Amino acid sequence: MINISEKAISARTATATGRIHLRRSTIQAIREKKVKKGDVLEVSRVVGTQHAKNTFLQIPYCHNIPIEGVDVDFNVGEDYVEVSCTLTTTYKTGIEMEAISCVSGALINIWDMVKYLEKDESGNYPETRIDGIHVVEKRKTPV
């Protein structure tokens, strides 16, 4: 792990985003809150937050940093759900890996909650895919 003891503390923010592509009927079930496992977006918000908080446990060279804020937002389109996670900290190292982890966790959870609606006759997922996970913005401000 990189030694950050000599680095200055800075206010840091990172935003990441990604999408899951789903059948239109699945999107309708999400909007109408008719998914068997519960409210997909609210559960995914919690899962994303948990993933952000546990990034250092999943990625061995990430530092355990003090997360001061997590905002998980959803944009539900006609055939996709876009997840956007913005995280903040005041620390010696960036928070972009936590933002990516937040997005990834939320997207994976969406898939888990709706997979029964997405499977075809053979049990596969021909229309379901997660893509576009990336850091949209990273800011660092001296304190």
From Swiss-Prot:
Gene name of the encoded protein: moaC
Record-linked InterPro entries: Mo_CF_biosynth-C_arc, MoaC_sf, Mopterin_CF_biosynth-C_dom
Cystines in this chain: none
Domain of life: Archaea
Active site residues according to the UniProt entry: D112
Pathway: Cofactor biosynthesis; molybdopterin biosynthesis
Organism ancestry: Archaea, Methanobacteriati, Thermoplasmatota, Thermoplasmata, Thermoplasmatales
Catalytic reaction(s) noted: (8S)-3',8-cyclo-7,8-dihydroguanosine 5'-triphosphate = cyclic pyranopterin phosphate + diphosphate
Protein purpose: Catalyzes the conversion of (8S)-3',8-cyclo-7,8-dihydroguanosine 5'-triphosphate to cyclic pyranopterin monophosphate (cPMP).
Gene3D superfamilies: Molybdopterin cofactor biosynthesis C (MoaC) domain
Residues at which substrate binds: Y61, C62, H63, M97, E98
Assembly behavior: Homohexamer; trimer of dimers.
Protein family: Belongs to the MoaC family.
GO biological-process terms attached to the record: Mo-molybdopterin cofactor biosynthetic process
Short name of one Pfam family: MoaC
One term of GO molecular function: cyclic pyranopterin monophosphate synthase activity
Keywords associated with the record: Lyase, Molybdenum cofactor biosynthesis
HAMAP family for this protein: MoaC_A (MF_01224_A)
EC number: 4.6.1.17
The protein's name: Probable cyclic pyranopterin monophosphate synthase
